């Protein structure tokens, strides 16, 4: 399987290198769908200029990246294009090996449940085979590397790509069962963009599964392991933040990065849900509604943990999608990360209800973004309502798509234990309805 992966990597790097050398690179780097005030390469360059002059990069209201990122590019500024191509390649490789190991765990668990007669007798067609799962890791790498969203993000040199790499390595180390490395990469991802904090719960649930520790409030082993993992995570985060202070000799980065993410002061249009509402809102209402909007990312973690505690990797997939939809400054690079997981759930396609319509909605919206932006900003024949309407449609399409996957997953799990052909009490055919 190594040769096909290398081929995919070569094709992906070639496409990116060609686009970097084309006239499209400058155009892509300015697209509001691809970069945000947090991830814009131009803002990184401005921060580097201030740093070279001996001025704090956070002294203005332009740079909002983390100190480790600015010091990374302080030394690698001349190789920025190569750094972003390597970053994408590392993300794909990490996802490839993560899903390869995950499939082994899934098949082993499925085999055990079959031996214990935990499945209904008429669900043979729902059982996954090694041949069916063989090419899934390669498809995941393919979906990530050749996704137009990922390519655009790389060519624009959006720092979202680095965040995706950290999350991918968090997933890999979690599936490998390394609690220490998992905590470190989760801390790095949280340090980079704050929202990956919500991935702590699915990561912990998976590691508990690997240790055969039951998720029970009365279990001493559960609390001991949870405390150890939490301490490794918090300790890593504290070390990273202290290192940032050591580099800058200042705490200015905390309000400039995390305060900026949470308070949403820059209302530059993007593909998110925040900017239009707060541009139209009176200032004295904004704090309340910022809290309401921000809580969406964190609110679903507990109910999802309760419902999907036996399936932490699917929980992780849903949570990454929730972050991509509800974060304050999303870009298409965030969307590309959870889309890479679609091949992992290819066994759910038969249960998806609206996959064709929702796919069409997302594709059409992606094509209309630059059109409506041009009509609004350059032609003057449209206004912000047009652009926000397509943004809202895009996000509703994502929400419905993820909801469809969630429904399909629960439906398949129900069929596995209760049988594929359900009957009502009177013997007639029954239909499964999710409420």
UniProtKB/Swiss-Prot annotation:
Record note on what altering residue 285 to A does: No effect on function in GPI-anchor attachment to protein
Pfam families per record: PIG-U
Residues in compartment: Lumenal: 23-78, 245-286, 373-384
InterPro entries per the UniProt record, alphabetical: PIG-U
Any one of the GO CC terms: endoplasmic reticulum membrane
Keyword Membrane tagged: yes
Molecular functions (GO terms): GPI anchor binding; GPI-anchor transamidase activity
Phenotypic consequence of residue 153 to A: No effect on function in GPI-anchor attachment to protein
Domain of life: Eukaryota
Localization per record: Endoplasmic reticulum membrane
Reported effect, residue 95 to A: No effect on function in GPI-anchor attachment to protein
Biological processes per GO annotation: attachment of GPI anchor to protein; GPI anchor biosynthetic process; GPI anchored protein biosynthesis; regulation of receptor signaling pathway via JAK-STAT
Topology Cytoplasmic: residue spans: 2-3, 100-136, 206-222, 307-311, 346-354, 407-435
Known outcome of mutating residue 67 to A: No effect on function in GPI-anchor attachment to protein
Disease with which this protein is associated in UniProt: Neurodevelopmental disorder with brain anomalies, seizures, and scoliosis: An autosomal recessive disorder characterized by global developmental delay, severe-to-profound intellectual disability, muscular hypotonia, seizures, brain anomalies, including thin corpus callosum and cerebellar atrophy, scoliosis, and mild facial dysmorphism.
Family: Belongs to the PIGU family.
Protein name: GPI-anchor transamidase component PIGU
Taxonomic source organism: Homo sapiens (Human)
Gene (name only): PIGU
């Amino acid at each position: 399987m190594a040769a096909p992966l290398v081929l995919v990597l070569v094709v992906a790097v070639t496409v990116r290198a060609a686009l970097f050398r084309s006239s499209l690179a400058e155009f892509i780097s300015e697209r509001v769908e691809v970069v945000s005030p947090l991830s814009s390469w131009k803002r990184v360059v401005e921060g580097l200029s201030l740093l070279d002059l001996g001025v704090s990069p956070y002294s203005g209201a332009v740079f909002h990246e983390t100190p480790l990122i600015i010091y990374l590019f302080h030394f690698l500024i001349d190789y920025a294009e190569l750094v972003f191509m390597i970053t994408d390649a590392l993300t794909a490789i990490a996802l490839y090996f993560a899903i390869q190991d995950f499939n082994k765990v899934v098949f082993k668990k499925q085999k055990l449940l079959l031996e214990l007669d935990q499945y209904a007798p008429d669900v043979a067609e729902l059982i996954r085979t090694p041949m069916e799962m063989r090419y899934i890791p390669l498809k995941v790498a393919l979906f990530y590397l050749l996704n137009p969203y990922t390519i655009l993000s790389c060519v624009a040199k959006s720092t979202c790509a680095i965040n995706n790499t950290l999350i991918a390595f968090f997933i890999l180390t979690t599936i490998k069962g390394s609690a220490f490395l998992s905590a470190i990469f989760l801390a790095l991802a949280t340090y980079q963009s704050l929202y990956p904090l919500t991935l702590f719960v699915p990561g912990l649930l998976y590691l508990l599964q690997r240790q055969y520790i039951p998720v029970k409030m009365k279990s001493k082993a559960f609390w001991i392991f949870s405390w150890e993992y939490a301490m490794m995570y918090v300790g890593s985060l504290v070390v990273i933040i202290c290192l940032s202070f050591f580099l800058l000799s200042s705490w200015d980065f905390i309000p400039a990065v995390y305060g900026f993410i949470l308070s949403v002061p820059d209302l530059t249009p993007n593909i998110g849900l925040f900017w239009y509402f707060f541009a139209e809102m009176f200032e004295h209402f904004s704090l309340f509604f910022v809290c309401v909007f921000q809580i969406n990312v964190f609110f679903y973690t507990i109910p999802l943990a309760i419902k999907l505690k036996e399936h932490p990797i699917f929980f992780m997939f849903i949570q990454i999608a929730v972050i991509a939809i509800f974060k304050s400054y999303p870009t298409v690079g965030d969307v590309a990360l959870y889309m890479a997981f679609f091949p992992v759930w290819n066994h759910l396609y038969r249960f998806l209800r609206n996959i064709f319509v929702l796919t069409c909605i997302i594709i059409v919206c992606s094509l209309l973004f630059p059109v409506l932006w041009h009509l609004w900003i350059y032609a003057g024949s449209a206004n912000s309502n047009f652009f926000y309407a397509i943004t809202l449609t895009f996000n509703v399409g994502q929400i419905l798509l993820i909801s469809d996957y969630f429904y399909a997953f629960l439906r398949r799990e129900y069929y596995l234990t209760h049988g594929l052909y359900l009957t009502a009490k009177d013997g007639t055919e029954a239909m499964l309805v999710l409420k």
